[in-house]
Amino acid sequence: MGKALMVQGTMSGAGKSLLVAALCRIFTNLGYDVVPFKSQNMSLNSAPSIEGGEISRAQYLQALACRKKPSVKFNPILLKPEGNMRSQVVFMGRPIGSVSARDYMLSKKAELFEKAIEVLKELMREHDLVIIEGAGSPVEINLKDYDIANMRVAKAVNAPVILVADIDRGGSFAQIVGTMELLSEEERELVMGFIFNKFRGDASLLKPGFEFLEKRCGKPVLGVVPYIEHRLPEEDSLAEFPKVRGDLHIQIIKLPHISNFTDFEPLHWANGVDYVTRAEEIKGDLIIVPGSKNTVEDLLWMRENGIEDAIIEAHREGSFVVGICGGFQMLGKEIIDEVESKRGRVEGIGLLPAKTVFTGEKRTNHLKAEVLWEPARGMWVEGYEIRMGRSTSEKPFSVITSINGARAFEPEGAIGKRAFGTYLHGIFHNFAFTERFLNMLRAEKGLEPVKVEEWSIEEEIEKFTRVVRESVDVEYIIQRLGL
């Protein structure tokens, strides 16, 4: 039977996901067979698994850090918010229904938790070490009885817990002491120690605080991780990246149910982007309608708030418009939806010659494709799809040539006048394509071409991990785990 180690935080945004990824890579580099696990995650940013299901982007990244192919076992329960306090429940990579927060809490959680723990124990039998990520805070008093992502998981497999605090936001000592006070005696016994994350400054100045914590809580500080500049995807934050301002004005519509906004990280680093929510803001060189968990409702939101008309007007005046996944569907001529919104036929924005019909089957695949859009014709791109709609167009954007490694020939997307749409999430992570596209827009403004800097998730994981390895007492963790 393998070992389990759990990382919990004093709050949401403490940095658990990336610390787990770093620990996964550290122990993998030490020669251990490691996998990540999170019993339940709530996120609109998902990724395809090896089984053809979907998992959260955080566990996808952590799997890469373990040098493993992402599996639905790493994130058995995924909740995808739909609005109006409802979420789609994805179990083992497949949607099993849509429920209200109250109904899920009272009826579904207990059953799914038991199944998730079975998956965790299976992983422990198959691997040397499972590194588990918690969710939010483990001591939200109003939710603690229903919490299936924190201490209940640790207790189920007797996993030592590292408690992480974000010192950059302030109040971290109080957060740690308060969390420890609100844990039960049994739960406190599971806590191995503390990590202070995102520190800027001289860590030696924290020594009196560490001595106080050890005396008060009886647990050691295992490390102080400095604030690390990186390009790793942030699961649920649109504002974590430093400001970048380039020559092009790139705008992304911040839809109420925006999903997979990690698609736009390369554009951020290459030029800078703005997320917009008001019609009067829309006037960019490039306007992007992103993916959505509720395509029709977000289309109607744009229509009701004048954003649709603003996009059409900006396009008429020369803006280039792109739609990704749900955004592509919205930019087409019509959508027939009896699945997500059940609104039947809805007129699209009409900038792309495409029609979409929603079906009950979700496609979740890795794709490779050849671009047909003239400025990048013949370029090879890859990405992934997570969608329930089927779209047809006489002018496809690309031809899919590989689905999960199997040969294919399937047109996808659509091309319009100064517009295109595609189902390929991650299209802009194809740096040669992005460079070609941005330089086309720059040339139209009389600007010199630029080189888009290439970077890889693998390089970013290694860079981030090196800093964590130097900052955390890994030897103490190994000793406590008995590895």
Swiss-Prot record:
Disulfide bonds: none annotated. It comes from the Archaea. PROSITE patterns: GATASE_COBBQ. Keywords: Cobalamin biosynthesis, Glutamine amidotransferase. Residues 247-433 form the GATase cobBQ-type domain. HAMAP family: CobQ (MF_00028). Belongs to the CobB/CobQ family. CobQ subfamily. This is Probable cobyric acid synthase. It comes from Thermococcus kodakarensis (strain ATCC BAA-918 / JCM 12380 / KOD1).
